[in-house]
Amino acid sequence: MELQKGKGTVAAAASGAAGGGGGGAGAGAPGGGRLLLSTSLDAKDELEERLERCMSIVTSMTAGVSEREANDALNAYVCKGPPQHEEICLGLFTLVLTEPAQAQKCYRDLALVSRDGMNIVLNKINQLLMEKYLKLQDTCRTQLVWLVRELVKSGVLGADGVCMTFMKQIAGGDVTAKNIWLAESVLDILTEQREWVLKSSILIAMAVYTYLRLIVDHHGTAQLQTLRQKEVDFCISLLRERFMECLMIGRDLVRLLQNVARIPEFELLWKDIIHNPQALSPQFTGILQLLQSRTSRKFLACRLTPDMETKLLFMTSRVRFGQQKRYQDWFQRQYLSTPDSQSLRCDLIRYICGVVHPSNEVLSSDILPRWAIIGWLLTTCTSNVAASNAKLALFYDWLFFSPEKDSIMNIEPAILVMHHSMKPHPAITATLLDFMCRIIPNFYPPLEGHVRQGVFSSLNHIVEKRVLAHLAPLFDNPKLDKELRSMLREKFPEFCSSPSPPVEVKIEEPVSMEMDNHLSDKDESCYDNAEAAFSDDEEDLNSKGKKREFRFHPIKETVVEEPVDVTPYLDQLDESLRDKVLQLQKGSDTEAQCEVMQEIVDQVLEEDFDSEQLSVLASCLQELFKAHFRGEVLPEEVTEESLEESVGKPLYLIFRNLCQMQEDNSSFSLLLDLLSELYQKQPKIGYHLLYYLRASKAAAGKMNLYESFAQATQLGDLHTCLMMDMKACQEDDVRLLCHLTPSIYTEFPDETLRSGELLNMIVAVIDSAQLQELVCHVMMGNLVMFRKDSVLNILIQSLDWETFEQYCAWQLFLAHNIPLETIIPILQHLKYKEHPEALSCLLLQLRREKPSEEMVKMVLSRPCHPDDQFTTSILRHWCMKHDELLAEHIKALLIKNNSLPRKRQSLRSSSSKLAQLTLEQILEHLDNLRLNLANTKQNFFSQTPILQALQHVQASCDEAHKMKFSDLFSLAEEYEDSSTKPPKSRRKAALSSPRSRKNATQPPNAEEESGSSSASEEEDTKPKPTKRKRKGSSAVGSDSD
């Protein structure tokens, strides 16, 4: 819903709310509850329900009584315990948001009853901002700003974090009224409470970074110019007075200052930065100091709203390469469709380069790579300025790259965009290479030597880390124009000559990374809906003696150990808990840490423990156990002793205590709450719990604890939680995934066997040895991965998987003792060109089976195609092994289908997705089989059931089909001649066609003739000589009996 107010009016509304009575921006928004917007189709939001429930508790206690009585009632209720304290705090908080007229009074009450320094309220504000802001009613948004202003005025500890979350919601490239209102409202708070702002270094840096970026968007109208001037004044004052705090931003501060350099105030600042750096701070030595400092991820992430960040992370972790178009289209419609949104592309590219660093498993999978998203962003730039800024954002970490300080992951996207664009989008590659060459002398001439060295170091590191095996194919490519190639040779002669002899890219190279999944020449759209494919000329390259370049080898990037820092959380902990956390931090050996961890758990379980500290404690533990979450979980050699030793880590003490408790115990709930808080901050905790329950003797038979854990998390759902944890495990440790698989399938059959989600996760990453291990588990009865009621659906789902994944799924299915008839209907879904994996697996399994009528029906239901040999292959095999049984089944099917569909029926059946068995199909397959058996001694078509069925079909089908299948029906003619002699006129009619006469006088082979005569003798002994004279339909009926 758009705001219907101008900038000044909105600001006035915000200031009105500050008095406790402001109506807010767009108060009375239609639809939804009092807090969130919704439609009649949306389910009621759980958070909103809880807040409204708490509000009704407060209202019921304070309605109709004096202010003093209300205060007494609230205080008495709060004293009952932590849950009651939380209810009152959240109730008053909700009243502040939904009742502007009562806001001042409710805030005063909140300040009086809060026992945790407003921690509950701060956490809830953060949750609303991160998860629900886009759905918040406008009144609530305005009141939220008012409440934050009051918290800041009161100097509440942690309010700076809420301000930073608020700033994150201000979208770049968006000048809609709501966004401008939010930018101005937060700026007003920061300006009014300047002394408070100056107490927090991180808030200073974050505010400067945010508003420096927003200044670029705010131009044009008088209202925007006024806001822009306020932003300029704010940033300049902080930069001049607190430059060293701003220095923590790193090199991206220079990039943002470049974008605003022509504004007079920043022009003066630039002069000081370049010519008089000491004027800003005695510790500031000059611009090179800034440029050589890498920008922290938190700054790059703060310029994307939570929704943008979620969508971008989803694309880079869940969407398969080739299936990204609809997600990109949605993102473009939502965020990149206006002229003002051009500036947002830089934020997105910096975020992708600096924050999105996928794991090796993701890098080596078919998940949409970072370079493809960046390529798409570059191709959608419509402004020259935006395109130049986007290219600078992409190469920014190259300019002063230092292998010791910077990450390969920051520079990898640029080289891969150029590499992969060469075939489908050579213009993109050319413009990026040109930019790379020209930025060296033009970025800042006095530092040209440093920039040259930075770019050279980047290219050198790229080759060393095997991101590309060598750069000559890129720099000296005939698709580039001569001038550009000449400039590249001049600037980078070291990288322009091919190595001799050719460098072999060995697959076992641990740091090799060769993403040569080029797109075919036919495909011109690798940044939208392209399928990943190798280039058409790859075979030619191989034939010329060059080593085939492998699709990808993940980078083994050296993990830079960041120092553990729990300082921000210590002040929020009780003194005794704080001491224990510090002991845990200082503990040098595992045993000492375990003792301290047990003391922490014991303190958490004490009756007077403040449960509001769980969140802070979880943040500390998450920080302290970073190395544990990064390290190997499963021991190299799996024995009982090594498993028991592996679960002796401090973190696992929480799990051990949980296993020793009764589930209805309040201590049990408290530990689950602690784990839930930990899970929010470190999702890996989920699969660590699964491992502990699987590996520890103390946890034997306690796997159901995981279900309690899942329900205690914010997800609140076992299936979702389990799948997310197994996905996290798959991305981190494939060995552990395989180790957990048997127990996960055994303990949670309803969650694992009903769909192919977990199976796909497993087969996507296992190798052949791990597959064989799982097959053994199945055959020994330790593992069940399929059950009869869902196996068919799972195998149908698997048809979209990669080839090796499908083969794995079939191998695992065949290890189970499930009758093949259960899955035979899958044949109706299989197309010979699209599903060769499933067809070959099914064919090999069918040859081991005795044919049933249902099997034969499904096999014959396949459409006839000259290149599809599936039906003929299996029918021929059954002819050799089970000829009599097959003949009976075919006879029965021919008789049942002995009526060609009418036109109306065929139209109806053709609209069905699944193939319907028709008489013509059966005859076509039989004719193909007849031709295949023509030169063999097999006498399948001389069997009585087949000949009888063909007789009856011939008697009732039309002339067109008699002609089409004349050779097939001729077999029945011979059987008819030898069994009964029909009237002359009938005989003449039967022999009237030349093909019939030829076949009548010259039988195909001796075996068929002898088979035919023996069949006749058999028929003569039965008292049924008059059947042949009846009408076809009655004959069919009696013969069927």
From Swiss-Prot:
Q: Which UniProt keywords apply?
A: Acetylation, Cytoplasm, DNA damage, DNA repair, Nucleus, Phosphoprotein
Q: Which residues carry this modification: N-acetylmethionine?
A: M1
Where does the record place the region Disordered?
Answer: 975-1041
Main localization category: nucleus
State where the protein is found: Nucleus; Cytoplasm
Query: What does the entry list under GO cellular component?
Result: cytoplasm; INTAC complex; integrator complex; nucleus; site of double-strand break; SOSS complex
Which GO biological-process labels does this protein carry? DNA damage response; DNA repair; double-strand break repair via homologous recombination; mitotic G2/M transition checkpoint; response to ionizing radiation; RNA polymerase II transcription initiation surveillance; snRNA processing
Keyword match Cytoplasm: yes
Pfam families membership: HEAT_Ints3_C, Ints3_N
Acidic residues bias: start-end ranges: 1006-1020
Q: Which cysteines are joined by disulfide bonds?
A: none
Q: What does this protein do?
A: Component of the integrator complex, a multiprotein complex that terminates RNA polymerase II (Pol II) transcription in the promoter-proximal region of genes.
Protein family according to the UniProt entry: Belongs to the Integrator subunit 3 family.
Self-association and partners: Component of the Integrator complex, composed of core subunits INTS1, INTS2, INTS3, INTS4, INTS5, INTS6, INTS7, INTS8, INTS9/RC74, INTS10, INTS11/CPSF3L, INTS12, INTS13, INTS14 and INTS15. The core complex associates with protein phosphatase 2A subunits PPP2CA and PPP2R1A, to form the Integrator-PP2A (INTAC) complex. Component of the SOSS complex, composed of SOSS-B (SOSS-B1/NABP2 or SOSS-B2/NABP1), SOSS-A/INTS3 and SOSS-C/INIP. SOSS complexes containing SOSS-B1/NABP2 are more abundant than complexes containing SOSS-B2/NABP1.
- Protein name per the record: Integrator complex subunit 3
What gene name does this entry carry?
A: Ints3
